[in-house]
From Swiss-Prot:
InterPro entries: MeTrfase_TRM5/TYW2 (IPR030382), SAM-dependent_MTases_sf (IPR029063), TRM5-TYW2-like_MTfase (IPR056743), TRM5/TYW2-like_N (IPR056744), tRNA_Gua_MeTrfase_euk (IPR025792). This is tRNA (guanine(37)-N(1))-methyltransferase. Its main location: mitochondrion. It comes from Plasmodium knowlesi (strain H). Specifically methylates the N1 position of guanosine-37 in various cytoplasmic and mitochondrial tRNAs. Methylation is not dependent on the nature of the nucleoside 5' of the target nucleoside. This is the first step in the biosynthesis of wybutosine (yW), a modified base adjacent to the anticodon of tRNAs and required for accurate decoding. GO terms for cellular component: mitochondrial matrix; nucleus. It is found in: Mitochondrion matrix; Nucleus; Cytoplasm.
Length: 698
């Protein structure tokens, strides 16, 4: 064992050196987590103190009337300081105290720039000032004196002869103040300092020590965060073509525009150059930059949070337990659209896929509205499952499904798939066992003015059994006769559903509703007034509080629906059950002849495979071994039923898992099956969807 240790000792030292080098570069070190930079971060005030920083950099001293001309130059603009919420042009009067005493340095840099431009082929004579004296090196090193020294010696002599010393001093002060008022400072960034250093070193010259040379991540483009768009610097990276022999581009050769254009402007316009020291802090940084500053080795983990309307949902690992509240305060403070920051306390294990919420910062308000593909979605995040990260998958399904398809969504949540696909004139049967989700499905149908979505609050098995009873899977069935509940009667438009024209609108349903009712409703005025009042509560404006929404429960069996609604008043303790007639239904005929394939959506990755056995009855009904009285195979009389079954699996086992579960539940495998990776839940757990035609299962 001792000899084994001696053999491993050199490797141990190499590993330690590697970890140290990674930590110095601010890179992740796998299991070696360095958190010492954040140990004393307790409050937002601590954060603001920690992120204070200074930049010492070059700046241009420009007359205010020439600033716009300078800023318009795209190549020059690349080298201007661009800091979040910090002005790119400063008033000299306000920042005079930030200018540094540099001795001969300013003049040396200016002479270098002028001579460099002349060697490249001129650049024009600058307008105004004493160009020759600057080019020869006779440059005043105090900027305040530089901007005042515009009068000729003859003018100064005449004034001195005519005025007393006191008057002369007063006049000089006035001229100095006026000159300072007209001057602006344009700070330059680390890219300029870096590129200038490279150029001057090639000629044996050095730039001042202590200048900012740190190229921020923002210098290479905008910074983005998964689940949400962050406010950030908009640093322009203009692609510039140039010929050989011009000014070198600098350290990032091939990406930076040449300094030549900026040098020419400095010489032509008689612009001074100086050194300025600027203070930056919390207000000049976005969320991403602040978190990188505090947690330099861990920030990529923190940044991955989900946005649900005004709610930011974070998933913290244990090592951030002591910092989660201050991180939440940063996110809340730096993103004005965020009002609530929460942490997920546990995994999704219950029937309704909800989780315990820990409020970290902001309002305790989980009723939110979000927008996806021009669809408004209202939900209570505490009561209903929602995942913004599945937007790409919802878009993929939308592109996959043809117009006039039939959608069967077993685990619909707030109904986002149906809300989206109803744009394509699809007839949608949308179900969720969560009564809160069912309630918001109906709210969102009204909110988005959808006309072809039928909603159900059933166990998935009972839901599919109901559809089997309606025989919507038969390709020979052209008319679907069914009884609709009051809620679904309000959700749909028969004119819209029964017309292949997507622009068709309902013109008469509301007027003939009473005459179409199968059930009997008492006709007296008092009863109608009560029902109207409750309808107002049930279909209140979407800006009303959640307490005024129905917590409706519906039970449907073989095409007949019963509904019982529960109303909440502003006082949570007062609850009244609506005596809306449970047996009131509406007989409707739906033209199935205009609809094509059926798409069954099973987005419950944890257990969706377990529900596939529901469709065994369908396979038995349309068996390949049975023929009708005309001798046709029964399977040919079945519509195409495309199954989209979502599941979790390890990346190395996903196909075997899908095949095993499908064979187990359906007793066979489809001829063809497509499996698509949806997203990575963790390194060893991915989400997939298995897609196949149920008609092809043998």
């Amino acid at each position: 064992m001792f000899y084994g240790f001696l053999l491993l000792y050199p490797l141990l030292s190499l590993c330690l050196e590697h970890v140290i080098s990674l930590s110095k570069k601010g890179k992740p070190t796998l299991g070696f987590v360095i958190m010492r930079n954040a140990v004393d971060i307790k409050t937002l005030s601590d954060v603001k103190d920690r992120v204070k920083n200074e930049k010492r950099t070059h700046c241009l001293v420009v007359n205010k009337y020439k600033v716009n001309d300078v800023l318009k130059n795209k190549e020059a603009k690349f080298y201007f300081l661009n800091v979040f919420r910090f002005p790119s042009v400063l008033k000299l009067r306000e920042y005079e105290g930030n200018l540094m005493e540099t001795g001969q340095y300013n003049g040396e840099v200016l002479r270098f720039i002028h001579s460099y431009v002349e060697r490249l082929g001129g650049g024009g004579t600058h307008v105004g000032g004493k160009a020759d004296s600057k080019a020869d090196g006779k440059v005043n090193h105090d900027v305040s004196d530089q901007v005042v020294a515009q009068q000729t010696d003859q003018q100064m002599d005449q004034q001195m002869d005519q005025q007393t010393d006191q008057q002369m001093d007063q006049q000089m002060d006035q001229k100095r103040d006026a000159a300072l008022e007209d001057c602006r400072l344009i700070p330059l960034n680390a890219r300029f300092n870096k590129a200038l250093q490279e150029l001057m070193q090639r000629e044996g010259k050095e730039i001042m020590e202590g200048l900012d040379m740190h190229l921020e991540e923002g210098d290479a483009g905008n910074v983005t965060v998964e689940g949400v768009a962050m406010e950030d610097d908009s640093t322009a990276h203009d692609s510039v073509q140039r010929n050989e022999g011009k000014t070198p581009k600098g350290p990032l050769d091939g990406q930076w525009p040449p300094l030549e254009e900026l040098f020419r402007i400095i010489k032509k316009e008689g612009i001074q150059i100086s050194i300025i020291q600027l203070q930056f802090g919390y207000d000049n940084m976005n969320t991403s930059e602040i978190l990188r500053k505090i947690f330099p080795t861990e920030s990529e983990v923190i940044h991955k949070y989900e946005m649900i309307g005004h709610i930011a949902h974070l998933n913290f690992c244990e090592r951030f337990e002591n910092y989660k509240k201050v991180i939440a305060e940063i996110i809340l403070d730096k993103n004005k659209s965020i009002k609530t920051v929460i942490n997920k306390m546990d995994t999704l294990k219950n029937l309704h896929r909800t989780f315990n919420i820990e409020l970290l910062a902001g309002e305790k308000n989980y009723l939110t509205t979000l927008k996806e593909n021009d669809i408004k979605v209202k939900l209570n995040y505490e009561l209903i499952y929602w995942n913004s990260k599945l937007k790409k998958e919802r878009d993929r399904i939308y592109d996959l499904v043809e117009n006039n398809s039939i959608i069967v969504d077993l685990f619909a949540g707030v109904g986002i798939f149906s809300l989206h696909l109803s744009k394509k004139k699809c007839l949608c049967f949308s179900n969720d066992i969560n009564s809160h989700a069912y309630n918001f499905m109906n709210v969102n149908i009204k909110l988005n003015k959808r006309k072809s979505i039928l909603t159900y609050n059933l166990d998935a098995r009972a839901f599919v059994q109901m559809l089997l009873g309606l025989d919507i899977f038969s390709s020979d069935k052209t008319t679907l006769s069914m009884q609709l509940s009051e809620q679904n009667w309000k959700n749909i438009s028969l004119d819209f559903i029964n017309s292949p024209d997507q622009n068709n609108v309902d013109t008469g349903k509301r007027k003939k509703r009473e005459s179409d009712r199968v059930g009997h409703v008492d006709d007296d005025i008092t009863a109608n007034a009560t029902i109207d009042k409750k309808k107002k509560l049930r279909h209140a404006d979407t800006n009303d509080p959640l307490e005024e929404r129905p917590l409706g429960l519906a039970a449907t069996h073989h095409g007949e629906e019963n509904i019982q609604s529960v109303e909440r008043t502003n006082n949570d303790s007062e609850k009244t059950k609506e005596d809306a007639p449970r047996d009131v239904t509406h007989q409707v005929d739906i033209n199935l002849g205009i609809y094509g394939d059926i798409h069954v959506l099973m987005n419950l990755p944890q257990t969706a495979f377990e529900f596939l056995d529901i469709f065994r009855e369908l396979l038995d009904t349309y068996s390949t071994d049975q023929k009708d009285f005309q001798g046709k195979c029964r399977r040919d009389q079945m519509r195409n039923v495309f199954i989209h079954c979502y599941f979790f699996s390890k990346p190395e086992l996903f196909y075997e898992d899908a095949e095993r579960n499908i064979r187990m539940q359906l007793g066979g495998l489809p001829r063809e099956m497509k499996i698509t990776e949806i997203r990575k839940v963790s390194p060893s757990k991915l989400m997939y969807v298995a897609e196949f035609n149920l008609k092809d299962v043998f």
